Amino acid sequence: MPPARTSRPSASATPAPDVPPARARAIQRRLLAWYDEHEEPFPWRTARDPYAAMVAAVAAQQTQMSRVLQIYDRWMAAFPNVPALAAAGRAEVLRVWARAGYPRRAASLHEAARVCVERYDGKLPRDREAILALPGVGPFTAAIIQTFGFGDDAAAVDTNIVRVLGRVVTGDLQPAKETPAATIAALAERLLPRGEASRWNPALMDYGAKVCLPRPRCEECVVASLCAARPRFAGGETAEPVRAQGAWHGSDRMWRGRIMQVLRDLPEDRGH
């Protein structure tokens, strides 16, 4: 098992808790072994295609993985590469996205593809800062592109990873509300095994989706004996729920959906 990665310097005054190397290696070893047994065979994880990784990462934002694969398959069938997406009209892009939710994500993918055609010969750049400069690309999407698209080491942070790292290392029961974002980011960097990002990032994501749930399945947890939150859960404490999304009817989301339906129905315009 590679040694725990040293965290990068942070401008935040909130330090990450110290993780002794032996404990870090034990956490890595157990979670990677769990992942090897429970790996989800999502196509973008093995394709080594930066574009496919970007599509999957954008589709996964605020969307359950059970739906992401449907969105991904439909999208890749219509726009199999960056030039194909860049050449499409906005109405066509939104029609393919259909009712996947948050249609601004589709528009951002479209804009990013056009930037890549204009600046990078129809390919995604490898440099992290250049990736982050693409429309709609934030730190999580950039890390997924680096990890699955290029095979580079990059620490990803999503809601599942926040929950796993926050509980195991800091002992917070509901890290999304209790653990500072800077602490989670530093932990993600510190615990990333060198050369293993393409296994480690999805291991954390899948573990948070299947075992370290909002109501954790501690009896199934392979790192229970290493988890700082386990004694609190065992003592009867519970994680305070994260506030649910507001009602749909009459909301901004409802009106955005109606506006996007009008845009989907517009005649095609393939101009740039």
Tell me what each language-model feature is.
Residues 11-31:
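Extreme N-terminal tail/first-helix region
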Residues 29-30, 34-254, 262-272:
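Catalytic cores of DNA base-excision repair glycosylases
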Residues 1-15, 246:
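Polybasic, lysine-enriched low-complexity intrinsically disordered terminal tails
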